C-alpha cells in the first residue's frame, strides 16, 4: 500500500512537470527528505529490461526502489558493473537508461573512435547519473525536476583512447582537428537516435563541459 501511494504521488509530480504549467509544484515530501525504501517486486517492464541486460552480457546489480521526496526517486534502477567499456561515476540508472547507454557506447562510440580516430575508446568518463535537483539553465529551470532526479539521465564528460589521448567535451567540442570534431559530432548524432534528449555545448553554457543524455521527453537534440 505504501509503495502504491508513493508511486502515485511520484507519477502525479512528474506529470505536473510536463504539463506546461510554469509554476513550481508543492511536493508531498520536500527534497532532501530521508529516503523511503519501497517494497514489492519490480514491474514486468523492469524485469524484462533486467533480462535484456543479461542477454547482452551486461553485468549489473538491481537497486532497491527508493523515494527521496520532492518528486525525486530511484525506481527500477540498476548499477552497471561491467559491459566491456569502463565508465566512471555511474551510480543509479533506470534500467532503460542503462540499456540505451550500453548500446550507445558499444555500437556508437567505440566504432566511431576506431573508424575516425584510429584508436578505440577504452574508458568513458561520466559526471554522474542520479541527483535530486531541478533543470540547470533556461528561464524555467527552477520549476522543473531534472531527469537526473529520477535516475533517468547521465552526463558524459570525456573519452580516453587506447593510444592515450583523452577527448573532452569542454576542450575539444570545437577542436580544429577535423577528426576529433567529426568523432564528437558523430557520437552526438548516434546519441540523438537513441535517447529522448541530448544536450551539448551547442545548447547552452550549462552544458559546456558535457553531453547530457536522458530518456525523458523528446526527441530533442541540440
Predicted regions and their residues:
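Bacterial N-terminal signal peptides that target proteins for export
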Residues: 1-9
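C-terminal motif of bacterial Sec signal peptides marking the signal peptidase cleavage site
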Residues: 13-16
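Sequence contexts marking disulfide-bonded cysteines in secreted/extracellular proteins
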Residues: 18, 48-50, 71-73, 94-96, ...
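Active-site-adjacent substructure of cysteine-protease-like catalytic cores
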Residues: 115-151
Amino acid at each position: 500500500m505504501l509503495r502504491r501511494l508513493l508511486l502515485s504521488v511520484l507519477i502525479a509530480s512528474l506529470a505536473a512537470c510536463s504539463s506546461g504549467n510554469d509554476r513550481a509544484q508543492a511536493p508531498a515530501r520536500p527534497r532532501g527528505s530521508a529516503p523511503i525504501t519501497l517494497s514489492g517486486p519490480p514491474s514486468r517492464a523492469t524485469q524484462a529490461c533486467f533480462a535484456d541486460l543479461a542477454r547482452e552480457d551486461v553485468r549489473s546489480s538491481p537497486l532497491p526502489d527508493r523515494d527521496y521526496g520532492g518528486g525525486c526517486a530511484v525506481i527500477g534502477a540498476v548499477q552497471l558493473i561491467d559491459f566491456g567499456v569502463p565508465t566512471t561515476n555511474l551510480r543509479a540508472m533506470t534500467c532503460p537508461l542503462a540499456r540505451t547507454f550500453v548500446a550507445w557506447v558499444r555500437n556508437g562510440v567505440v566504432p566511431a573512435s576506431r573508424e575516425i580516430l584510429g584508436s578505440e575508446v577504452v574508458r568513458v568518463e561520466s559526471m554522474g547519473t542520479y541527483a535530486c535537483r531541478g533543470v540547470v539553465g533556461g528561464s524555467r529551470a527552477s520549476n522543473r525536476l531534472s531527469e537526473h532526479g529520477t535516475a533517468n539521465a547521465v552526463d558524459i564528460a570525456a573519452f580516453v583512447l587506447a593510444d592515450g589521448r583523452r577527448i573532452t567535451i569542454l576542450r575539444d567540442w570545437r577542436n580544429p582537428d577535423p577528426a576529433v570534431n567529426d568523432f564528437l559530432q558523430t557520437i552526438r548524432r548516434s546519441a540523438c537516435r537513441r535517447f529522448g534528449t541530448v544536450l551539448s555545448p551547442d545548447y547552452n553554457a550549462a552544458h559546456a563541459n558535457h553531453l547530457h543524455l536522458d530518456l525523458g521527453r523528446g526527441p530533442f537534440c541540440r
